[in-house]
Each structure stands twice: as structure tokens, then as C-alpha cells.
Amino acid sequence: MAFSRRWQAGVLCVTGALLALGDAAPAVQRAPASTGRLTALVGGTLLEGYAGPPIRNSVILIDGERISAVGQVGSLSVPSGAEVISTEGMTVLPGLWDMHVHTMIVGHADYDHWDKAYAPQFESVIMPAAARQLLMAGVTSARDLGGPLEASINVRDRINRGEMPGATLYVSGPFIQHEPYPNTEAYRWGVQGPADAHAKVRAIAAAGVDVVKLIDQDLMTIDEVRAVVDEAHRRGKPVVAHAHRPEEIRRGLSLGVDCFEHTGLATAPAYPDDIIDAIRERTAKMALGPLYWTPTIEGLLNYEYLRDNPEALDDPAWHEGLPEPIVADIRRSLEHPDRLPYFQLTAARRPTLARKFKQLREAGVTLLVGTDSGIPMNFHTQSTWRELDAWVSTLGVDPITAIRAATYWPSVAMKVDRDVGTVSPGKYADIIAVRGDVLRYIALLQRVDIVIKRGVRYRPDPSRH
């Protein structure tokens, strides 16, 4: 079937012989009609983002930027004049989320050099390139955790206004922490006392951040941490906090942090018993909702592979939107990945991941897919599918659960599930499609064939068809 064409007949209604190829048709789901452009995705196996079985021979109708109906061939007709896009032989699923990205960095190994050389280009070049790279990799939404306040807000808003392509960003602005590291004051804000903590959170909330990023809370006073969390919640902002050290977790749990990030910088083989007990106590309090955790494991799991197979770094997709001198500088910084200080403890940390991941699952946290993309060798074009692959292929998570951790649950965590997170009538048409069976071969997500965000097709480029 041709990939795309303008359907001129009155309706598309596939015969019973075709219908027999799939499951019995579910009830057609519809949203109120509107008057936008009409598109139909026809024929693929749909993973809605819920936990139900796949929908074979699916039909998804898109009216403008939102989904108007979901059904199957033979039970859902395609309106006259709609553009029909064949998804035959593909898995169709909600656009992916990456719940931990850094758009101000794009894989360079030397942060100090990067900040000094490229900070003036963060807003105009680096962050837009990162957001576009995420989108073209099938990541239609991302949580950007740590960046200059004004640049983060401006890039997010330009994307939302349709002025440039990119993943929809949910931004934290600067890290809130005990004190900024040297020469990082533009995107790391220190707090000195509870009053200052309240003031800093009020400032970023007033600027329009979506979430508050708290780190090094074990170095802060209890009253400072409480001030950050309470002020954020007072202003309707969830708090995301580092979980690198045990005391960071203890303080975050006791004071109401909503989501923890990472699995820890230490090489201890497991989380201490008291922390697991505290997590269990928190997850048992159903009235508080889920306790979220973004483990960001693929960078650790894949380091040795990338170190020993440097051709994997040659994928030109991560160059997109970056001037050649910046690409060349990134390449130079990665010439000797085995020497990078960033990864010297990776060999000792890597064996702890499976145990910690299992502990978190058994303690009842709701795990989210996030990658720390932008850190050394961790390009925005590759990290999200690798995280999903690591969950499924290395850690034994079933594919549907992993996919929901990158679609449904992030939308719930960010309180935008009325608009995104599943392929459902009335929600934004954030949809991707991949040739082949993703439930059997999760790594197929490394080559996304179709990317649609808010009803606009970005991959493949429609102007080339």
C-alpha cells in the first residue's frame, strides 16, 4: 500500500475478508467532531498505552491536532477527503516520553569546557537542536531537568507556539541545591536558609516552570528542604529530587518529594533496608498517589558497549541542528571514552543496577522511563529506545509495562493525561509507528518510521512524498 495518499472516495470501509485478519472489532471510540485537517492511520497494530491487548488492523482518525476516533478496519470509516497513511505491518503507539533529559547538553564529555564555550548558544542553537532530535527519535514529550531559567522557558514556549519543531518540554529551570558548583550559577541556584529557599522556588514558579528540581538535599538543612518542597507544592509544582545518596532519599521521602531520579552514584550492592521500608510505607498510602522513580540506567548499562564499539557514536542523527564546529568538538571530547572521569566508577556501579531496580519495583514505586540524555556519549537521538531496551532485554520487564512507563505513566505524573499519554479520542495526536512487532523486538524503536505530534507529521518528511 502506498505510504500516503489523498482518499477521494466517500469512505474507506475494508471488507470482511480483511477484517478476518484481525481480532473482533472493539467498540469504536469517538470524540466530538471539529473542523481541522483530517488524517487517518490505517492497518497497524495499535498499543493504546493502556494495559489491554493490542488492537489489530487499527484505524485512528485525526482531526486537526487531536484524535477524533479509534477503531478497526471494517468498523470505523474514514471520512471523504482525509489523508490516509498506511501503517500496515507496523506497531502504532503513543509518542514516547523521556522523563529525564538535559537539552542544554548534547553528549560532550567536558562540562566545564562546554559551559564556557557554548552557554551563549544554549537558547538559540543547543536546546532547539536537542528538542528536535528527541522529536525525530519518537519522543514527543520530555521533562527537561536542569537548565538556565529564561532559556528553558523560552525554548519550551517557542515549541508550544509552533515556531520550531521539538518535543513538548516540561521544564524545571535551574537546579535548586545547597550551593552551586563553580561557574554553574546560571543554571544551579543555591539556597541559604528557609526564607531563601521559599524565595527561589517562588521565583522559578512565577517564571512558569512545570516542575522543581531538587538535588544535594542531604547537604541542606531539613528546614531548607521542607521550604523547597512546601513552596513548590503550594504553587502546584511537583518536586523531582536526586536519589544518588541514601540520605537524599531519606529526606526526600520524609518531606514529600514526588519523584526520585537515578539509582545512585555509590557502589553499594543494594538500597539500605530502612530506605526500602520507608518506600513501602509511602507507596502504601494510596491517598497520596503513586511514588514515581526515574532510574536512568541505560547510560551505565551501555557504557562498555559504546566504549568498545565507537562506531555506534558515528550515527549522524545526533548532528542534526548542530553547527559542524560543535559536532567536531563533541567528537574530540569522546576520542578516549575509557579515560573519561565521568565513567570511572561505572564498572563498579553497573552490577548494582539489577538489584536496585528490583528493589524499587518490589517496594511499589511507579517507574518512569528517563535517560539523562545529553550526558557524555548519551545522545538525545538514541537514549530513550536504549532505556526501553535495557528494561526489557536486561532487566526482564515485559514490553507493555516498559512502554507504559514511557507513555501513560509520565502523562499521569505530569498531570497532563487528559491530553496525552494514550492513543484515545479527544487527546492530542502524539503518535509514532515502527515497522515490525515492538512487543517482540523492543529495539525496533531505534528506527521510528512515523512521528506525528499534535496532528503534524514530522517523520517521514511529508514534503518528500
Where are these regions (language model features)?
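Metal-associated gating/positioning segment near the N- to mid-region
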Residues: M90-R158, P182, D223, H244-H262
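Bacterial N-terminal signal peptides
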Residues: G10-A20
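Active-site core of metal-dependent hydrolases
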Residues: L214-R349, L368, I375, L395-G396, ...
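His/Asp/Glu-enriched, well-ordered alpha-helical/loop segment
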Residues: R234, P337-Q344, R350-V434
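Divalent metal-dependent hydrolysis catalytic cores, especially in the metallo-beta-lactamase
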Residues: M127-E150, A167-P174, A207-Q217, P238, ...
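C-terminal cap of metal-dependent C-N hydrolases
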Residues: A406-Y408, P425-H465
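Acidic/histidine-rich helix-loop elements
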Residues: T103-F122, H178-A195, G264-A270, D338-L345
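Histidine-rich, glycine-flanked metal-binding segment
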Residues: R30-T35, L46, G52-L93
